[in-house]
């Protein structure tokens, strides 16, 4: 059956986020900031949530192209903070179309296994981890996403009723290629937490279908951020051949344009028929790494 409405195949229309209202947790640095800049520069109104007020204010002042980055100080792992922020947005705007749950931590230092590592040395390194640090990694990387989703569901539902954009409301959760790789790129706690948040998001995508709220997962490889600064710096002196092996087959880490392309696709009409998907942006790293993706 043909539609009486002629679809627009113009990229500027398909990938437009003009008029979209978004919330990005952990939006003041790293991948979160890349997402915020891409959305706001293309016409979205973006609330950014983070703990450091001075960093949030600096982003709003220096990075906003249209004055539509609104800083809201708060800890996305705190239920009282989330309730306060939701109340503020409800009063000011009344709805959102997109939640990007991006807040997270890297967790413990990786456990290194070299050709000379003995089993007793490995056991010592594994056993020495403070259980509270292991638990914190899950609490932040999984729990923060869970409670952010729960907190913003009413505003996402209101976005569907508002109908200011064609696509239905959506939550995008930042995971990692660490969720899929069998060679641990970080500590086991980090990789496991990202696998957990990935599966949880897929379950939300299934559970909330009747409410027309979509859920998708963004799984980045190596991007520059506060969290990865040391890793990125350590790769600077590598030869092109070494970079292709250790960083990605494309020989580089991700950049703002790479992340902007992902988020504009997912958040716009171009991605309106996506739900329960995992978008891997890693320069092909998982293609050359043992993985379960």
Swiss-Prot record:
The gene is phomF. It comes from the Eukaryota. One of its GO terms (molecular function) is oxidoreductase activity. Belongs to the short-chain dehydrogenases/reductases (SDR) family. Pfam families: adh_short_C2. It comes from Diaporthe leptostromiformis. Short-chain dehydrogenase/reductase; part of the gene cluster that mediates the biosynthesis of the phomopsins, a group of hexapeptide mycotoxins which infects lupins and causes lupinosis disease in livestock. The role of phomF within the phomopsins biosynthesis pathway has still to be determined. The pathway starts with the processing of the precursor phomA by several endopeptidases including kexin proteases as well as the cluster-specific S41 family peptidase phomP1 and the oligopeptidase phomG to produce 10 identical copies of the hexapeptide Tyr-Val-Ile-Pro-Ile-Asp. NADP(+) binds at residues 31, 102, 190, 194, 225. Its EC number is 1.-.-.-. PROSITE patterns: ADH_SHORT. InterPro entries: NAD(P)-bd_dom_sf, Sc_DH/Rdtase_CS, SDR_fam, Sec_Metab_Biosynth_SDR. The keyword Transferase does not apply. The active site is at 175 (proton donor), 190 (proton acceptor), 194 (lowers pka of active site tyr). This is Short-chain dehydrogenase/reductase PhomF. Keywords: NADP, Oxidoreductase, Virulence. The keyword Cell membrane does not apply.
């Amino acid at each position: 059956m043909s539609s009486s409405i002629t679809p627009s195949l113009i990229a500027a229309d398909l990938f437009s986020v003009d008029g979209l209202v978004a919330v990005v947790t952990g939006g003041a640095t790293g991948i979160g900031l890349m997402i915020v800049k891409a959305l706001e520069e293309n016409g979205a109104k973006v609330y950014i949530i983070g703990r450091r007020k001075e960093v949030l204010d600096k982003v709003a002042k220096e990075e906003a192209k249209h004055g539509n980055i609104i800083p809201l100080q708060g800890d996305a792992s705190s239920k009282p903070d989330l309730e306060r922020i939701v109340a503020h947005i409800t009063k000011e705007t009344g709805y959102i179309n997109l939640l990007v749950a991006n807040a997270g931590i890297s967790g413990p230092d990786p456990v290194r296994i070299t050709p000379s590592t003995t089993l007793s040395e490995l056991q010592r390194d594994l056993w020495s981890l403070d259980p509270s640090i292991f638990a914190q990694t899950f609490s932040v990387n999984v729990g923060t996403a869970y409670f952010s989703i729960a907190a913003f569901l009413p505003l996402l539902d209101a976005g569907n009723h508002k109908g200011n954009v064609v696509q239905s409301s959506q939550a995008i959760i930042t995971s990692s290629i660490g969720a899929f790789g069998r060679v641990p790129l970080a500590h086991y706690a980090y990789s496991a937490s990202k696998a957990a948040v990935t599966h949880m998001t897929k379950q939300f995508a299934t559970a909330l279908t009747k409410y027309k709220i979509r859920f998708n997962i963004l799984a980045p490889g190596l991007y520059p951020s506060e969290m990865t600064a040391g890793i990125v710096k350590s790769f600077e002196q590598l030869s092109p051949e070494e970079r292709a092996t250790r960083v990605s087959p494309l020989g580089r880490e991700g950049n703002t344009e790479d992340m902007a392309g992902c988020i504009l696709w997912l958040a716009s009409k171009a991605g309106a028929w996506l739900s329960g998907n995992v978008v891997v942006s890693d320069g092909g790293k998982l293609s050359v790494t043992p993985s379960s993706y």
